[in-house]
Design a protein with these regions (language model features):
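Extreme N-terminal leader/targeting segments of oxidoreductases
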Residues: 1-11, 29-30, 132
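N-terminal Rossmann-like FAD-binding beta1-loop-alpha1 element of flavoenzymes
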Residues: 11-36
């Protein structure tokens, strides 16, 4: 008979992409014992393929940008069938999340006056994408992994959930 090792967690997060890592970090910060399961090696999630950047109305390149304009662009881009509240929350929270990543060690491209550089992307009225060259997803995963591991999140790699 095979023997199995058992673990006891308050929260088990399945998937170690950007969303799974961020959920694990949030739960751990609340004092909850977290286990994170990924089917491959940590850092191999699809988030690393994201090249363009993170849409956030930081107003670093054009000071006319704000969360309401970002929200309107998001709704228009989704032909108004998006979940209204989720689009609104994203537009409101995105600048805080970008600064959070930066405080955790993410290294974004910079303007001449050392603000986070933003570039144009389809459907956005103003330059809004905070980026790290064409490796934004890789930098985001690296930052979230490092922060999560330093918080003591237990990571189980190469596991299958059935």
């Amino acid at each position: 008979m095979d023997s199995y090792k058992t673990f006891d967690y308050d929260v088990l997060v399945i998937g170690a992409g950007g969303a799974g890592l961020r959920a694990s970090i949030e739960a751990s910060a609340a004092g909850i014992k977290v286990g994170l399961v990924c089917k491959s090696l940590l850092g191999k999630a699809h988030t690393v393929m994201a090249e363009g950047g993170i849409a956030a109305a930081l107003s670093n390149v054009d000071d006319r940008d704000d969360w309401k304009t970002h929200f309107a662009d998001t709704m228009r881009g989704g032909q108004y069938v998006n979940n209204y509240r989720m689009a609104e929350l994203h537009a409101q929270e995105a600048p805080t999340r970008v600064h959070e990543l930066e405080s955790w060690g993410a290294v974004f491209d910079r303007t001449d006056d050392q603000k986070i550089l933003q570039r144009n992307f389809g459907g956005h009225k103003y330059p809004r994408l905070a980026h790290v060259g064409d490796r934004t997803g890789l930098e985001m995963i690296r930052t979230l992994q490092d922060h999560g591991i330093h918080q003591g999140i237990d990571v189980h790699m190469e596991c299958t959930i059935i």
